[in-house]
């Protein structure tokens, strides 16, 4: 029944006591369906309760006397039975503590018995169905108006929902369902927040039980379409509630309905949005509680990867981000591989520990699921009847986990990730990092994370059983190295991509063992299980190279249209990873000699990629550290031998080299030949391949740093080639020549100065890779030779030196674009700051510092801008912790930084909302002041230098006195509150305290109290440190604060839009949302309590701790408040109970007065 105003009259007279004649009632067969009515003693005992029972008007006039008919007695007995069953059922469930599900099931049986009794007596003098529904109405109305002990109230709702479901299953009348629908519809429009919360929870339970137990065709969640549509529309209406606590149960209810198909005869109002669509839109709700429940309730699909990734990246609530990341565990890792790799890579590098832990949990679930599926596929038919006890419980000793095949699941993920990752150096580097985290997770799953790495290797070997080798891709171990790419049954059934994945995972596993070793003995013992001695490894690798060469005619991939390019990528990857494994092989003198000769023969292959050549040269350079000229001479002689032996397109074989990758190079030459109209490859084209190979090796040799000087021999041999290569049509040639000239200039700057000046004049017309190479080269030269590089800019008056040149690149770069040149310029400035002696008084360094500070304050719009900001902040943090002069450079740049933003014509670079300019710059001030704290310096610097914040305060006072009308002062003055006053001497604090008093008096009568408030905050902080008894003066609200207070409150609106706001792209710009729920309506305010006395602990002196402002620019302020926990039901949030009327017990007491 709907809530209504009950008119209470005088107290009813008590029923007269008369002799009971209950034998007639017990003999009536029409009311003997329940066993409770077969006991005459129970009927006699219940007659005493009849006196205190308030029934309907018809029943209350019936009295038990000798002249009463059997029908009248049965009516009263049935009414007592109904009341007793309803009260007992609801009371038992509400007060239950153990076996809650059993209690709900038993109580539902009692309610069904009472319902049947009322249904049988609906045609008697008194409609007992109305009595049954009134009792339900009274009990539910007492529960629905408040939300205290929510888990107990939820049990009652579950009880009614289960009862309705069973009544529907037994094909009984729908009186109870109709009554509940009317009850829900009425209370759903109540002004009471608790009533709306409980109503929505009630609907969710009804849908949940109907979906679970009723599967009738032509119905929706077990109910008729018309009835289900009413409840669905009620949930949809609840999504528009202004209270987030009332929207949460509605969102959870939609989670139960998201997988149920919408019927064709669904009403028009309900067909506008499906439950899943409404649930996904709730992921954008303004309240973090609603977003959290929406993410947790959704059943993720592969099409939701983009939505979940955006939530993980950009949501402002940490709990919501973690919940979205956990949903990836429910997705298969074999779809949208690249997006999932990027997401996990970023999460594993996130500064929040919870995000990193959740990402590792995703990896753990993927590994466990793969190993479980593999184990199930390996079970024989004879083992189906075996019952495994406690299969869900994890072993504490780890014995059961050592035969699970987790390591094979990790290799399967590696094969999957390699197919989706980018074939670039950065892509493979990120993938190796991801596999390293996966191995950490597997080590925990094997329960040996605290043991030496040798124990982990032993566990892996014991897990690789023979039946695993025959049915899955095997792990490469010491005993299987020689079978890589061999002509075996395994090689015939797998393509080269699988073999590449095996080798890649082998390399990652070996690197992991080397990094996680406790000592050399631990590493040697663990490595001996996966790598053979160096001499044996050389023999294996020589055979493997021949097999890699034969991949050019592999039958499984030769049918691809681009099989040459695909095979070339696989070949280079295999060779690269094998060389990386060779680094960890146990060495002996014969093995070292064989390894050196193998590297020389590999270096003579002109078809390798640049990354493979770099790797070979790095390994080979270790043998020529004492005599680098011998290596250069050997290389030059072999190049001349190649040129002399090259004939008619046939490349010579030098030092028994294996021409891996020749097919790809020949294909490119043939295509170039067809474009020019020639039939055969000319000698000029072949010589061009050798020349490019010479540049690659020369570049790799110079980067090793083993060369002692750029002698005349090298000048005569390479200078002309390098100058000609700068103007080449091939981009790779120009990049290689630029890098070589830059490295050569480090040894002899004079011989390369003119070439570098010509390149700088045409800098703007060069391609981006050439610009990046030139910036890196000039940076290395300036670090080595100082300001000599500035002479290259003498022709340009606007950019007189290298520092200004780099600053202009950073400033003029487009904000939204991803400019690689700008990123290299930022990195170059960072290297100059950290590797050169900086004078804080020089104008060029101040300008460069302002450029970095300005770029770091830009709004984050994508991953590229986040990378630029993190690079600058991390560099400045390290730079300012070296010495005092570095801190002075940052402090002297403060004025120009704030002056730039005060006169900026593009404030949207800082923030999209102009009204947040002061807030954003205040956060920037907090960050940059925190970087210059005196406590960040080494102890020796702290003792011999005074704090640089003294100079900062002097600069602020000078600016206030010199240009009081400047807008930059409003920003500059924000830095006062973040100064580390604790490190200042008492005399300095006393002087600052006195100066502040004069400025406070000067600005006391200002119209806008912003400056006055900022000065007062700093004044009180210093007074507290000095121990002065200063009267606490309240801050005067500024004009901005007054405008905020005058703005209309959002709580005046009745409904909130379902489509609220998009997830913020810039986390650092948007301020944290208000997570405090407001009242649903103006309620009576009780008198506040008297203020409590100050506890003794509060009177103790506490150390002054300032918030670390370095975290401000990294991420937005996080809400550390945890979401509401529900240990029992986990279904409803806690809401502020706002009653609209006294409780029924109070009304009853007033009516009896």
Curated annotation (Swiss-Prot):
Keywords: Cell cycle, Cell division, Chromosome, DNA condensation, Meiosis, Mitosis. Residues 1-31, 1038-1153 are annotated as: Disordered. InterPro entries: ARM-like, ARM-type_fold, CND3, Cnd3_C. Belongs to the CND3 (condensin subunit 3) family. The lineage of its organism: Eukaryota, Metazoa, Ecdysozoa, Nematoda, Chromadorea. One of its GO terms (cellular component) is cytoplasm. Residues 1127-1144 have a biased composition (Low complexity). This is Condensin complex subunit capg-1. It comes from Caenorhabditis elegans. Component of the condensin I complex, which contains the mix-1/SMC2 and smc-4/SMC4 heterodimer, and three non-SMC subunits that probably regulate the complex: dpy-26, capg-1 and dpy-28. Within the complex, interacts with dpy-26, mix-1, smc-4 and dpy-28. Component of the dosage compensation complex, which consists of the condensin I-like components mix-1/SMC2 and dpy-27/SMC4, and the three non-SMC subunits dpy-26, capg-1 and dpy-28. Within the complex, interacts with mix-1, dpy-27, dpy-26 and dpy-28. Interacts with smcl-1. PANTHER family: CONDENSIN COMPLEX SUBUNIT 3, CONDENSIN COMPLEX SUBUNIT 3-RELATED. Residues 1038-1047 have a biased composition (Basic and acidic residues).
């Amino acid at each position: 029944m709907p809530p209504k105003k009950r008119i209470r009259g005088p107290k009813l007279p008590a029923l007269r006591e008369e002799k009971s004649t209950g034998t007639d009632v017990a003999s009536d067969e029409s009311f003997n369906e329940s066993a409770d009515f077969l006991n005459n003693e129970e009927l006699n005992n219940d007659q005493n309760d009849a006196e205190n029972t308030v029934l309907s008007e018809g029943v209350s006039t019936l009295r038990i006397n000798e002249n009463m008919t059997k029908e009248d007695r049965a009516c009263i007995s049935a009414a007592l039975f109904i009341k007793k069953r309803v009260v007992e059922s609801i009371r038992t469930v509400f007060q239950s503590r153990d076996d809650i599900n059993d209690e709900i099931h038993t109580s539902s049986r009692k309610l069904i018995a009472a319902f049947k009794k009322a249904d049988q007596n609906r045609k008697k003098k008194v409609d007992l169905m109305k009595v049954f529904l009134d009792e339900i109405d009274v009990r539910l109305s007492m529960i629905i108006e408040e939300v205290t002990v929510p888990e107990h109230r939820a049990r009652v709702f579950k009880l009614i929902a289960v009862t309705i479901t069973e009544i529907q299953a037994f094909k009984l009348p729908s009186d109870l369902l109709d009554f509940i629908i009317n009850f829900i519809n009425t209370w759903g429009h109540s002004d009471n927040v608790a009533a709306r919360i409980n109503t929505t929870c009630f609907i969710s339970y009804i849908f949940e039980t109907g979906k679970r137990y009723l599967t009738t065709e032509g119905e929706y969640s077990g109910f008729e379409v018309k009835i289900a549509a009413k409840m669905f529309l009620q949930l949809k209406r609840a999504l528009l509630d202004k209270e987030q606590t009332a929207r949460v149960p509605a969102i959870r209810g939609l989670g139960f309905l998201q997988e149920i198909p919408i019927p064709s005869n669904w009403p028009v109002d309900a067909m506008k949005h499906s439950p899943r669509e409404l649930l996904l839109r709730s992921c954008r709700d303004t309240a973090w509680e609603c977003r959290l429940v929406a993410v947790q309730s959704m059943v993720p699909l592969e099409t939701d990867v983009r939505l979940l990734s955006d939530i993980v990246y950009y949501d402002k609530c940490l709990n919501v981000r973690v919940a979205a990341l956990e949903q990836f565990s429910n997705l298969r890792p074999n779809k949208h591989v690249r997006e999932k790799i990027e997401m996990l890579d970023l999460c594993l590098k996130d500064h929040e520990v919870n995000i990193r832990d959740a990402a590792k949990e995703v990896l753990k679930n993927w590994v466990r699921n793969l190993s479980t599926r593999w184990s199930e596929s390996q079970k024989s038919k004879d083992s189906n009847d075996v019952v495994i006890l406690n299969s869900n419980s994890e072993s504490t000793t780890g014995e059961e986990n050592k035969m699970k095949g987790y390591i094979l699941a990790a290799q399967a993920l590696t094969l999957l990730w390699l197919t989706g990752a980018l074939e670039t150096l950065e892509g493979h580097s990120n993938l190796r990092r991801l596999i390293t985290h996966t191995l950490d997770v597997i080590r925990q799953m094997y329960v040996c994370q605290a043991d030496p790495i040798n124990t982990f290797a032993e566990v892996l070997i014991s897990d690789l059983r023979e039946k695993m080798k025959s049915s899955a891709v095997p792990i490469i171990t010491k005993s299987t190295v020689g079978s890589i790419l061999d002509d075996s049954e395994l090689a015939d059934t797998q393509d080269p991509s699988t073999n590449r994945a095996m080798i890649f995972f082998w390399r990652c596993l070996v690197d992991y063992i080397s990094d996680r070793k406790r000592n050399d003995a631990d590493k040697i013992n663990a490595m001996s299980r996966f790598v053979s001695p160096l001499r044996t490894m050389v023999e294996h690798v020589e055979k493997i190279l021949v097999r890699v060469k034969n991949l050019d005619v592999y039958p499984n991939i030769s049918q691809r249209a681009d099989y040459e390019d695909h095979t070339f990528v696989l070949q280079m990857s295999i060779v690269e990873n094998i060389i990386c494994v060779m680094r960890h092989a146990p060495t002996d003198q014969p093995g070292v000699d064989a390894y050196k000769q193998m590297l020389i023969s590999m270096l003579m292959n002109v078809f390798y990629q640049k990354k493979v050549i770099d790797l070979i040269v790095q390994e080979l350079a270790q043998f020529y550290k004492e005599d680098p000229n011998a290596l250069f001479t050997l290389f030059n002689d072999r190049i001349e031998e190649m040129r002399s032996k090259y004939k008619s397109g046939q490349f010579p074989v030098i030092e028994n080299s294996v021409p891996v990758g020749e097919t790809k190079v020949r294909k490119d030459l043939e295509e170039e030949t067809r474009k020019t109209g020639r039939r055969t490859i000319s000698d000029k084209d072949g010589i061009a391949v050798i020349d490019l190979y010479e540049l690659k090796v020369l570049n790799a040799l110079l980067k090793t740093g083993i060369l002692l000087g750029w002698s005349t021999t090298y000048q005569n041999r390479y200078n002309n080639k390098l100058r000609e290569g700068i103007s080449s049509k091939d981009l790779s040639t120009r990049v290689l020549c630029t890098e070589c000239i830059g490295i050569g200039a480090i040894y002899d700057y004079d011989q390369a100065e003119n070439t570098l000046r010509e390149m700088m004049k045409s800098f703007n017309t060069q391609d981006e890779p050439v610009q990046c190479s030139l910036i890196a080269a000039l940076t290395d030269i300036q670090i080595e030779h100082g300001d000599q590089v500035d002479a290259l800019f003498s022709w340009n008056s606007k950019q007189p030196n290298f520092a200004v040149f780099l600053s202009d690149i950073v400033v003029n770069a487009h904000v939204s674009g991803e400019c690689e040149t700008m990123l290299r310029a930022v990195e170059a400035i960072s290297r100059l700051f950290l590797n050169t002696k900086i004078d804080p008084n020089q104008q060029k360094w101040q300008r460069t510092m302002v450029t970095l500070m300005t770029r770091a304050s830009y709004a984050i719009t994508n991953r590229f801008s986040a990378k630029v900001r993190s690079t600058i902040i991390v560099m400045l943090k390290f730079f300012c912790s070296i010495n005092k002069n570095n801190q002075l450079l940052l402090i002297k740049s403060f004025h120009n930084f704030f002056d730039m933003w005060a006169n900026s014509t593009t404030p949207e670079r800082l923030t999209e909302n102009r009204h947040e300019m002061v807030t954003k710059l205040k956060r920037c001030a907090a960050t940059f002041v925190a970087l210059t704290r005196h406590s960040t310096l080494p102890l020796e610097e702290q003792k011999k230098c005074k704090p640089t914040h003294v100079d900062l305060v002097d600069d602020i006072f000078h600016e206030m006195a010199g240009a009081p009308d400047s807008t930059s002062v409003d920003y500059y003055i924000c830095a006062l509150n973040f100064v580390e006053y604790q490190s200042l001497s008492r005399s300095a604090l006393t002087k600052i305290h006195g100066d502040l008093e004069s400025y406070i008096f000067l600005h006391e009568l200002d119209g806008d109290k912003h400056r006055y408030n900022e000065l007062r905050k700093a004044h009180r902080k210093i007074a507290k440190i000095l121990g002065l008894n200063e009267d606490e003066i309240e801050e005067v609200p500024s004009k901005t604060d007054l405008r905020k207070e005058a703005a209309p409150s959002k709580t005046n609106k009745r409904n909130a839009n379902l489509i609220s706001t998009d997830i913020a792209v810039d986390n650092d710009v948007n301020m944290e949302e208000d997570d405090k729920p407001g009242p649903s309506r103006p309620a009576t305010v009780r008198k506040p309590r008297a203020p409590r006395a100050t506890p003794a602990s509060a009177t103790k002196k506490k150390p002054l701790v300032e918030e670390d402002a370095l975290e401000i620019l990294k991420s937005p302020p996080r809400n550390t408040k945890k979401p509401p926990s529900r240990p029992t039901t986990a279904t409803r949030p806690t809401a502020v109970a706002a009653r609209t009327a006294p409780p029924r017990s109070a009304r009853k007491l007033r009516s009896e007065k």
